[in-house]
Design a protein with these regions (language model features):
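Secretory targeting and sorting signals
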Residues: 1-17
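Catalytic-loop region of hydrolases
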Residues: 15-113, 137-139, 443-490, 660-661
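Accessory cap/linker subdomain of secreted extracellular hydrolases
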Residues: 84-145, 210-322
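Alpha/beta-hydrolase active-site loop
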Residues: 134-135, 145, 167-186
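Conserved alpha/beta-hydrolase
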Residues: 144-159
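Alpha/beta-hydrolase fold nucleophile elbow
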Residues: 187-199
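C-terminal, loop-rich substrate-recognition/catalytic regions characterized by aromatic stacking residues
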Residues: 278, 373-661
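Short beta-strand/loop motif that positions the catalytic acidic residue
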Residues: 323, 329-331
Length: 661
C-alpha cells in the first residue's frame, strides 16, 4: 500500500490570520513610505568604545539630522549591529541605497527582474533588495530618519577594532553587553537599545539578549544560528565545505584592511596591527587540518575542539530560555541555520506576539526574498521598523498581533499559525522498498516508499559522487550563492539523483501536509570502517520535478545518539535524534555487519498537492554541503555503501503528517 490516501490539514486557532499583516501591515508600510521625521543623517565615524579589558572597539554612529546634516539634540532609542564584516560593508550598502536615483533604480530593477532559466537564480539574489533584506544588512536610514540612533560596531578582532577575533565566544558576548551599556549612557540615548542584523550579527543579538543587559529592550535577529556545529560547521559530522572555507577567508581577509584615514592623519593604531600579526587567520589552520588529517591521532587539540561537540560550542550557544525581551526571528527552510531558527523561537519563554517566527523559503544570502509581494509578509525593513516602533517607542501599531508563526509552506504559499510544528501532526513510518516506483528511471536506483513493510529483502548499493554541486543541498551549503546555477539545480534533484537511491510514494489525491522535524532510519552495511550518508525528502511533481523540502546527513562512525537530548514521536521512533558528535563516542563500523543509523533532517513545513508524491533520496556523499572530516574520509576509503531492506530490520522515514493521511 503506497502513499495514496488523504492528508487533511487541521486548522489552528489563528489559521485565518493574514501573513501580509492585513490593515496593520499597510500601516507599517505607510510608515516607511511617507516623508521621514528628519531630513538628514549625521554620521560620526570610528567612535572608540573601550571594553573592560582595555580593548578598543570602533563604531559608526548614525543619528537623525536636520537639513544641514547637523545631528538633532533630542534623545532617541538606539539600535545596535555588531559585525565581523567591517563597518565598511554596511557603509557601502547604505551609500548605494541612499542615493535617490541609484536606490530607486535598484529597487525598481529588483522588483521587476524575473529572468527565465538558466538565469532565474539571479532574480532570487536580487530579491534581497526588493524584500528589504539589504536595508537590514546595512544601515536602515528609515530608522535613523524617524528618530532612532543606529550604531554599527566592528566586532573584536575584525574591521578596525583591536584585539583577536573571538568568533562569538564569551569575551565577544561580554563586549556586546558593555557596548549596550555604553550606548544607553550617551547623551543622544533615551536609555532604550534594540539589536538587529543578519547572520553573525543576529547570532550575537540572541547571545546578548540571553545575557539580559538592562538597557536591551528588543531584538530583530535575521537568520540566527544557535548550534553552530550542527547548523553548518559539522552537520552530522560532515564539514560544511561550501561555506566555512569561504567565510573564514573573507572575514580574516577583511580584518587585515587598515583604517586608511587614520594612516593619512598619522593616527595609525599599533595595537590593531599587533593583534593582526598575532592572529592573522583565525581558525583557518584548524579548518585545513580538519580537512586534510588522515588520522585522529594527528589532529591538534585546537582542531579537535572545533571539530567535535564540547565546550567550544557550548560557550557559543545562547540559553534562549533566559531571553526576556521581545524577539522576532526570521529564518528560512533552506538557510544554513534552519536547524536553529525554530528552536530559538520555541525556546524563548515569552507570550506569543512578544516572540515571533517567520520562516521563508530562501537561502542565507536571500533574506526577505519575495517579501512585500501579494500574499507575502511585509518587507523585512518594514517589519524591523514596526517591531522597534512598538517595543522601543511604545507605538500601538499592532505588530504584537502579527503571526506569531508565519511560514512559507513548501508546495503551497504563505500561512500563519500559532505554533511550529503545527498542531495535529502525527508521525508515521513510510518504508523504503526495493519495488520500482516507475517514476525515477534517471536515478541510480528507483525504489518505492510504502506504508507497509517490504516483503522482499534487498541490498542496494550507492557510491560517493560529486553531483551535489548541482543540487538543493549544494545551494544551501554555499549559503545560496550557487543559486545562480538556476532552478534546475537548486530546486530539482534529478541531476543529483543520478548517483542516488530514490524511494518514491504514490501520488496523493488531496492536499497532504507535513510539519516538523523528520528522521530517516537506515539499516546499512559498509565495506570499510566508516562512511557518510546524506538524505533528502522531496516533493515530486507530476512532470517529474523533484523539489527538496528538507535534508540531513551523518558520518556513520558518529551515529551514537544522546537520548537525553533527543525526541521520539508517539510511535516510538526518533523524530529528532541528537547525535553526540564527539571523538569519545565515535564507533567505527565493522565492515560487512548491518549497522543502523538515524539521520535527523531539518525541520520543515510542506504540502503535497494532488498528483504529487513524497520521495526520499539517499546518497553516499553530498559535496559541498557536507564533506566527512579528514580521518573519517580516509577510513571510508570512498568505497560504495549499502542499504539493507528487510521486513525484520526495515529502513524507513518517520514523517509528521498533519491531520493524518
Amino acid at each position: 500500500m503506497g502513499l495514496c490516501v488523504v492528508g487533511l490539514t487541521v486548522p489552528s486557532a489563528v489559521a485565518s490570520a493574514d501573513p501580509t499583516g492585513g490593515s496593520d501591515g499597510q500601516t507599517w508600510l505607510a510608515a516607511t513610505e511617507t516623508a521621514p521625521q528628519y531630513p538628514g543623517v549625521s554620521v560620526e565615524w570610528d567612535v572608540p568604545i573601550t571594553m573592560s579589558d582595555g580593548t578598543v572597539l570602533q563604531a559608526n554612529v548614525y543619528r537623525p539630522a536636520d537639513a544641514s546634516g547637523r545631528a538633532v539634540e533630542s534623545k532617541a532609542p538606539s539600535v545596535l549591529n555588531i559585525t565581523p564584516y567591517t563597518k565598511l560593508l554596511g557603509t557601502l550598502v547604505d551609500s548605494a541605497l541612499s542615493i535617490p536615483q541609484v536606490g530607486e533604480t535598484l529597487m525598481d530593477v529588483a522588483n521587476s527582474l524575473d529572468l527565465a532559466a538558466p538565469f532565474d537564480g539571479v532574480s532570487e539574489l536580487t530579491g534581497v533588495i526588493a524584500g528589504g533584506g539589504a536595508r537590514v544588512l546595512g544601515v536602515n536610514r528609515d530608522l535613523v530618519q524617524n528618530g532612532y540612533t543606529q550604531v554599527v560596531v566592528d566586532a573584536r578582532g575584525t574591521g578596525f577594532s583591536q584585539g583577536n577575533w573571538d568568533v562569538l565566544g564569551k569575551r565577544e558576548q561580554q563586549d556586546s553587553v558593555e557596548v549596550i551599556d555604553w550606548m544607553s549612557k550617551q547623551g543622544w540615548s533615551d536609555g532604550k537599545v534594540g539589536m538587529a542584523g543578519i547572520s553573525y550579527s543576529a547570532i550575537n543579538s540572541v547571545q546578548a539578549a540571553s545575557n539580559n543587559p538592562p538597557a536591551l529592550k528588543a531584538i530583530f535577529p535575521v537568520e540566527p544560528g544557535n548550534d553552530l556545529l550542527r547548523d553548518i560547521v559539522g552537520t552530522g559530522g560532515g564539514l560544511g565545505v561550501g561555506f566555512m572555507p569561504l567565510w573564514l577567508t573573507a572575514v580574516n581577509g577583511l580584518k587585515l584592511i587598515p583604517n586608511v584615514q587614520d594612516i593619512l592623519q598619522g593616527n595609525f593604531d599599533p595595537l590593531w596591527l599587533a593583534s593582526r600579526l598575532e592572529d592573522p587567520g583565525t581558525l583557518i589552520p584548524e579548518l585545513v587540518q580538519a580537512m586534510t588529517a588522515q588520522r585522529i591521532e594527528d589532529v591538534s587539540p585546537s582542531t579537535l575542539q572545533v571539530a567535535q561537540d564540547g565546550q567550544f560550542y557550548q560557550d557559543r550557544s545562547a540559553d534562549v530560555g533566559n531571553i526576556t525581551v521581545p524577539t522576532m526571528v526570521y529564518g528560512g527552510w533552506h538557510d544554513i541555520f534552519a536547524n536553529s531558527e525554530p528552536r530559538i523561537y520555541n525556546g524563548i519563554d515569552l507570550p506569543a506576539g512578544q516572540k515571533q517566527l517567520i520562516m521563508g523559503n530562501g537561502y542565507h544570502v536571500t533574506p526577505g526574498g519575495g517579501f512585500g509581494k501579494d500574499g507575502a509578509p511585509p518587507r523585512l525593513d518594514v517589519l524591523e521598523r514596526a517591531w522597534f516602533d512598538k517595543w522601543l517607542k511604545g507605538i500601538d501599531n499592532g505588530i504584537e498581533r502579527y503571526g506569531p508563526v508565519t511560514m512559507f509552506q513548501q508546495g503551497g504559499g504563505w500561512i500563519t499559525d500559532d505554533q511550529f510544528p503545527r498542531a495535529g501532526a502525527t508521525y508515521e513510518r513510510m518504508y523504503l522498498n526495493s519495488a520500482p516506483s516507475g517514476t525515477a528511471a534517471h536515478a541510480a536506483y528507483d525504489g518505492s516508499l510504502t506504508s507497509d513493510q517490504p516483503s522482499a529483502a534487498a541490498r542496494l548499493t550507492v557510491a560517493p559522487g560529486l553531483r551535489g554541486f548541482c543540487s538543493g543541498d549544494g545551494t544551501q551549503g554555499t549559503a545560496g550563492i550557487s543559486v545562480v546555477l538556476g532552478a534546475s539545480c537548486s530546486k530539482d534533484s534529478r541531476f543529483q539523483e543520478a548517483e542516488g537511491l530514490t524511494f518514491t510514494g504514490e501520488a496523493v489525491t488531496e492536499p497532504t501536509s507535513l510539519s516538523g522535524p523528520i528522521n530517516v532510519h537506515l539499516e546499512t552495511v559498509l565495506d570499510a570502517t566508516d562512511g557518510f550518508w546524506a538524505a533528502t525528502v522531496n516533493d515530486v511533481a507530476p512532470d517529474g520535478t523533484s523539489t527538496p523540502i528538507t535534508n540531513g546527513a551523518l558520518t556513520a562512525s558518529l551515529r551514537a545518539v544522546d537520548d537525553s537530548k533527543s525526541t521520539r514521536s508517539a510511535n516510538g521512533d526518533y523524530s529528532e535524534p541528537h547525535h553526540y558528535l564527539t571523538i569519545d563516542t565515535r564507533q567505527p563500523v565493522v565492515p560487512g555487519e548491518v549497522t543502523a543509523v538515524d539521520i535527523n533532517m531539518l525541520p520543515t513545513d510542506a504540502v503535497l498537492q494532488p498528483g504529487h508524491r513524497l520521495r526520499v533520496d539517499v546518497y553516499a556523499a553530498s559535496v559541498p554541503r557536507y564533506l566527512a572530516l579528514g580521518p573519517m574520509l580516509a577510513d571510508s576509503q570512498l568505497k560504495p555503501q549499502h542499504i539493507e531492506l528487510a521486513a525484520d530490520r526495515p529502513s524507513f522515514v518517520n514523517v509528521p503528517f498533519v491531520g493524518g493521511r
